[in-house]
Design a protein with these regions (language model features):
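Short beta-strand segments within Ig-like beta-sandwich modules, predominantly Fibronectin type-III
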Residues: 113-120
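Beta-strand-rich modules
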Residues: 123-147
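Edge beta-strands of extracellular beta-sandwich domains
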Residues: 145-155
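Conserved aromatic anchor
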Residues: 82-95
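Active-site-adjacent mobile loop/cap segments within catalytic or ligand-binding domains
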Residues: 1-68
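Short beta-strand elements bearing conserved aromatic residues within extracellular beta-rich modules
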Residues: 98-101
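Proline-enriched interdomain boundary motifs that mark the N-terminal boundary
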Residues: 67-77
Length: 156
């Protein structure tokens, strides 16, 4: 998708798309075959939906623009232990006032739990077993904006 070049350069990139594509309209040359119209044409554009999508993109871009830099070198520990440990490089950016830990069950598509942990470079989640959850860390700015959540990329 068009978001990949941004991701490849280290920028947050998101792809927003219609999940139920109409292959008579999309990815087709404009033509009529057996009475069926094919191709992307202006009469097939839902302008109310396009307006909403544009607003969502603008809001998300503003949010990303205001957000602080994400935590670097996020690592996870706690293998064969009853608790999970996370650590990361603490930022020298004075705008970052703290960090937030996220975790969710491995079967969940959404973050279910979070904890503000202050301006520290490590945290231990007692009683949270590493095998049962996915984890992430975000940075929080003094104005309350939050970076993208970073998954651990190494173990310790």
């Amino acid at each position: 998708g068009h978001h990949r070049p941004f991701n490849d350069l280290g920028y947050a990139g998101v792809r927003i798309m219609e999940a139920h594509e109409n292959y008579n309209r999309q990815h087709q040359d404009i033509r009529i075959e057996d009475g069926i119209e094919y191709g992307d044409v202006i009469s097939g554009v839902n302008f109310k939906y396009a307006k909403k999508l544009t607003a969502v993109n603008a809001i998300n871009l503003a949010s990303l623009g205001w957000s602080p830099k994400e935590p670097k070198n996020v690592k996870i520990g706690g293998i064969v232990e009853p608790s999970t440990k996370l650590k990361w490089d603490i930022s020298k950016d004075k705008n970052i006032i703290g960090y937030k830990i996220y975790w969710r069950k491995t079967t969940s598509p959404f973050w279910e739990n979070s904890r503000l942990v202050g301006k520290v470079n490590n945290y231990k989640l007692n009683g949270i077993v590493i095998d049962n959850y996915l984890f992430g860390v975000s940075s929080i700015s003094e104005k309350g904006y939050e970076s993208v959540v970073v998954f651990p990329n190494d173990v310790f």
